Each structure stands twice: as C-alpha cells, then as structure tokens.
C-alpha cells in the first residue's frame, strides 16, 4: 500500500529525514517510536504533502502511484488521513458541516443530510461525544481530550485507506485513551492500514501491531514486532542509540 524509498527531507536549511525506508502492506498496523525531534511527525506530514517540507531525494508510492507531485488535497482524496498531534480550531465551520463536506469531496458522491446526521450521532455516542458538539465550530473551545476524540470521529466518518495517527493519545487520561483505542480498533480492518506515533502502549491494546520502528535522528534504526514497544517502555531509547 505505502512504499517509501531512501527519503530525504528538509525544512529550510535543516535536514530532518535522512534516507528513510518504510513499507506498509494493506491491513497492517505499524507503530513509530522515538524521542521528540527525531523526525516522526515530519514523516507523517510529508506523506500527506505539507508544503513546509521539501523532499530532496527519494520516493513515496501509495497504491503504486508516486505521491511526490500531488497536492495535499489530492492525497487526501486518494484515501490518506492525518490525525494531528495538536488539532487546530476552525471558527465558523461546524463539526457536522466540515465532515459532511469532506466526505462528499473524497467520495465524489452527494451526501444525504439526514442520513449523514444520523450516522454521525451514532459514532459520536460511541466516542462519548455529546450530540450538541455536531453543531459547534470545529475544535473551538474543545478540551484536549475532546479534540482527540473528534479526530477519531473524523477517522471513522471519512474511513480512509491509510490512517496516520500522530500521538492521538497524548495528554489523555486512562479512560479517554481507552475510548480512542477502541475507536481506532473499530476503524481498522484488512482493507486499510495504520501508522501510529505513540509513547503510550495502551492505545495499542485493541490493535494487532504488525511492525514497530525506532526513529532516531531522522532514520529508522531498528524495526521489529510488537515486542519493541515493550522494550522502549522498559529501557527507553538509549540501547538503540548504541545499536545505531
């Protein structure tokens, strides 16, 4: 599904990703672990085409198509979704209107307003989001936990092929992480894939982790199975710095 080869990326004069390789097959869940500033969020943004970053070398293929010439909205229409670490507030646009418009843009099909409203409220109930939030402006006045659950609401509503989740669990209490984890598990199936950045193994409890990758200084220094998540939880990143 996703193939990244020898990816070099810079922002301004600073090189951030240094020869990164990553392959994600349909149906897989990949976890990215690494200290702050190691390039994890940069990778997510580059996959979706953030204009801040410049690819100086390498390739990104999604379902066999080279993404590097595509704009952000074109990549989103291909089925790529990014859940932001710090979701932005968008005054003037309600949650329901934004999600309905986004889904219509991605699918190219006209969305029936009443049917969509009913489906949205059902998802909101599962995520323990009060129904009145559907008519509130996107993330305006939302708490940190409400913003993160709203990201999962977007994920479930838009149903992308590839979900990029950038610390969707950060800053959440135990109960909120459980809700988010269950929401991601509800989304994931054999026809889509997830790449998850996290420092908290709890969000992974409902997910079958296929591969875990250790990020250091803009590179993947080690890849393995779910056991890497436990190794990092117990020993931190120092052992991998020695290996790299």
Tell me what each language-model feature is:
Residues 167-168, 175:
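Walker B catalytic motif
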Residues 20, 24-26:
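Conserved hydrophobic segment flanking the Walker A/P-loop of ABC-type ATPase nucleotide-binding domains
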Residues 33-35:
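The feature captures the beta-strand-to-loop junction immediately N-terminal to the Walker
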Residues 2-4, 17-19:
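Conserved structural motif at the start of ABC-family nucleotide-binding domains
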Residues 86, 92-107, 119:
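Q-loop/switch helix immediately C-terminal to the Walker
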């Amino acid at each position: 599904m996703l193939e990244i080869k020898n990816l070099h990326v810079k922002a301004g004069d600073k090189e951030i990703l240094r020869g990164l390789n990553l392959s994600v097959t349909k149906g897989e869940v990949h976890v990215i672990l690494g200290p702050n500033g190691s390039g994890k969020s940069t990778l997510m943004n580059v996959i979706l085409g953030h204009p801040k970053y410049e690819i100086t070398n390498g390739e990104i293929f999604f379902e066999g198509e080279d993404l590097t010439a595509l704009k952000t909205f074109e990549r989103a229409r291909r089925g790529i979704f990014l859940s932001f670490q710090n979701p932005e507030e968008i005054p003037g646009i309600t949650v329901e209107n934004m999600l309905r418009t986004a889904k219509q843009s991605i699918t190219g099909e006209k969305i029936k307003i009443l049917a969509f409203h009913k489906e949205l409220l059902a998802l909101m109930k599962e995520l323990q989001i009060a129904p009145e939030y559907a008519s509130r402006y996107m993330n305006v006045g939302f708490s940190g936990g409400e913003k993160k659950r709203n990201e999962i609401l977007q994920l479930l509503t838009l149903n992308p092929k590839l979900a990029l989740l950038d610390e969707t669990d950060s800053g959440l209490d135990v109960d909120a992480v459980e809700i988010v984890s269950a929401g991601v598990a509800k989304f994931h199936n054999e026809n889509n894939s997830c790449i998850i950045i996290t420092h908290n193994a709890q969000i992974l409890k409902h997910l079958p982790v296929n591969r875990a990758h250790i990020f250091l200084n803009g590179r993947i220094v080690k890849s393995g199975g779910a056991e890497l998540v436990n190794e990092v939880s117990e020993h931190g990143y120092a052992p991998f710095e020695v290996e790299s």
